[in-house]
């Protein structure tokens, strides 16, 4: 069955729910005290994992559309990408306010220098910021061929973000490795595309 624009609208509603309902759960968890003895760390990890999940979902859309021969699925990619940026911003805010504290926000610059995994995180967020800011049709027309070059930086984020997660975890957990493996698989699916860049 071929997807129609009506189907895509329904899928977008599902994306909104899948991306927004975890935020409501996060708020409820904070209010009800469902987190561990270190809720600040739990919130940071939760928002970070949501960012990674949405990043991987964004990267999954193109190969899924190609292999299932459903080209209209591409219309969902921008929405997932914007939610990825939104959760990435929540992740940055949670670290800045809960880990450092509002009174020590000026320490963020020093933290970026002394903790390399934070450097990878902020680079990833800045790229997502640029992609979100230029995700409109107007920006696409304005930038021309440069638009695609800029948005190819999402592949760099797909490398940096899992490393950021792996590096930041103090105790062993399989989750960072799972996300890293999924990122490698999704990048490997684009092997021919990357190979053509070097020709």
Curated annotation (Swiss-Prot):
Disulfide bonds: none annotated. It is a multi-pass membrane protein. Keywords: Cell inner membrane, Cell membrane, Electron transport, Flavoprotein, FMN, Heme, Iron, Membrane, Metal-binding, Transmembrane, Transmembrane helix, Transport. It is found in: Cell inner membrane. It holds the Pfam family Ferric_reduct. Binds 1 FMN per subunit. GO terms for biological process: protein repair. It comes from the Bacteria. GO terms for cellular component: plasma membrane. Heterodimer of a catalytic subunit (MsrP) and a heme-binding subunit (MsrQ). Belongs to the MsrQ family. This is Protein-methionine-sulfoxide reductase heme-binding subunit MsrQ.
